[in-house]
Amino acid sequence: MLQRAVWRWHLVAGLFVLPFLGWLAVTGALYLYKTEIERAVYAEWLSVEARPTLPIGTLVASVGAETGARVVQVARPSAPEAWRMTVAAPNGTRRLAFVDPGDGRVLGLTRAGGITGVLRELHSLAITGPIGNALIEIAAGWAIVLVLTGFWLWAQRPRLTVRGSPNGRGFWRDLHGSTGALGGAVVLFLAITGMPWSGVWGRGLQSLVTAQGWGRPTAPAGEHGGHGGHGAALPWSMQHAAMPMGGAGDIGPDRALAAARGVGTAWTMTLPATPGAPYLFSALVARADDAHVVAVDAASGRIVQDARYADFGAGARAIEWGIAVHQGQQYGEPNRLVMLAACAALLLLVVSAPVMWWRRRPRGLGMPPGGTGRGLGLLMAAAGAAFPLTGLTMLAALGLVRVQGWLGGR
């Protein structure tokens, strides 16, 4: 009874989310190589002559005059290439400018975020709006159910061999089971660590962490403001944290950078969006351990916040670490290759599942009978409570199963 129930829900979960998991596998693999893709797409715009850089204030003024827009963010890369500047037009439209730091020329303009932003939005389906992002969140929740039920089914007949030929059902069953057994743990890790980016669950977690002070550094006493839409340049734990506000006045970006020298040589600078807002620097790093954010009072040049990874609480450190591993950055190239292998395994699971199901369907074994066992029901209820959007679709799936059973009994 339990095995039939687990198999039924493993199949139901797969039918719900296989296309989305395939999408996540392909776009996730591409995102792992976002740096290489960006350098290939923008090769002409990134190449600059090696020479001393102009003062940041001069660069900002030059880019503003050339684009007719206000520079809101400056990113200095670690490589000797063009700087990136985000500019905001009077109508609110934002674009990304590639700038030669040696003379201030704009080498190219593209949409805000560039190709990296496109890959990120494709991966999360945010490019389609809130509905698409919600579907990806649902898929990630169901992926957790798929992996756990799949492990249980495989454990009933543990085998890591592939027998027969592709013409037989056994080949595809063995291929699916062996792939899931070998790669399932990493797929489960990706599903869980990807949740903090989701639109509903992720924002809820982020708001909770921010509101309760669980993990993010405590902001200094005084007035606080938002990030003016630039929170994505910060570590996840600080993207909705209030920033300390200072007095009126502006010392300029060069003096602000001089005050924040400890942030390193590769950084993102967010310029004050409103009077009293600080200059906000975030180190461009790969490892979560190297995260560093510095806020400089625009009026006085005083450092009003200096937050490093060690200043985060255990909860925030765990989330930041998970995100860095998820992106294949925390442990260098081996980390990226493991994540790439997980994407390949997930894609193989997505392809083999419908083939396996179709080959058993003509024999009358398409959807196994049986309800939901008590233990499995409690597990799914817990998963549904933890991930509400997934829980709603679980209820819908349960309703469909009940209807099918009722129709089959007539």
Regions found by a protein language model. Give the residues of each.
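Conserved histidines in hydrophobic membrane contexts and catalytic metal-binding motifs
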Residues: 1-410
